[in-house]
């Protein structure tokens, strides 16, 4: 035995259980606001219970998990934590809507070297706000204080979401046909992708995040939360024959559009059908980034691309605009030759 008679505690090792309990009390109100009628019980149990909505005849569960990448580093540098949770929810639920699924519930994982209750409460309040925007319930989560694993009060977040779709209504891209129209739904900014390049551009150019651009600071443009498309997209799906939806995330146009296209088809995008939001123009100029690389890294102002019959395109655009989205016809589906790229931007 050691000659040291002092009694060690978990807190001495860097884990403050009282801080964790204080956080749970702080976030209870935010979590309660996200509740759906299918949720059984409150937070704090070992597992969270949720019934399936009764309106589905053959319900299929759709799941997704994601993080926010190095956008988090920017939030830490700017000491602004109240919207990063919205990003986290958006990255998960927007992947579900691609298959026509309505998000049901969400869980989060928050890991840090030393728990700052105020910062964590801000993050989780943002997660709750994202869940409200998406119409899903925040039913549980894990807060892990891990001294020695993270530097100081640095933290990381991950999210997990489950949604439901009627089996016969699953959107999987198999109906995509030559001649289909492509409509774009506008993004709110870079969303949560490409931030390693964003940070490199800031470093190499020496740009100041407090510099003004179109009435806002560069930092504000870059921390603008990811748009959550659930409510407007569900309305569109209800009223139109949607053949495919692509969520433009990491890998941009070149990587994400082909994921929903059948073999032998390609998306022909009219690059002149929209003007890039100013933040993308600024990033390209400051980083001297080639246009193809921009399309391969960023969403360039396009959050979703939707394939549907040509004769329904204008009505779908009008509906999305009525729901407050920026939407426009961005291109069409054409036949692709063997070995040809599935995305063509003119």
From Swiss-Prot:
Pathway: Purine metabolism; IMP biosynthesis via de novo pathway; 5-amino-1-(5-phospho-D-ribosyl)imidazole from N(2)-formyl-N(1)-(5-phospho-D-ribosyl)glycinamide: step 2/2. One of its GO terms (cellular component) is cytosol. InterPro entries: PurM-like_C_dom (IPR010918), PurM-like_C_sf (IPR036676), PurM-like_N (IPR016188), PurM-like_N_sf (IPR036921), PurM_cligase (IPR004733). Pfam families: AIRS (PF00586), AIRS_C (PF02769). Keywords: ATP-binding, Cytoplasm, Ligase, Nucleotide-binding, Purine biosynthesis. It is found in: Cytoplasm. The keyword Nucleotide-binding applies. One of its GO terms (molecular function) is phosphoribosylformylglycinamidine cyclo-ligase activity. Belongs to the AIR synthase family. This is Phosphoribosylformylglycinamidine cyclo-ligase.
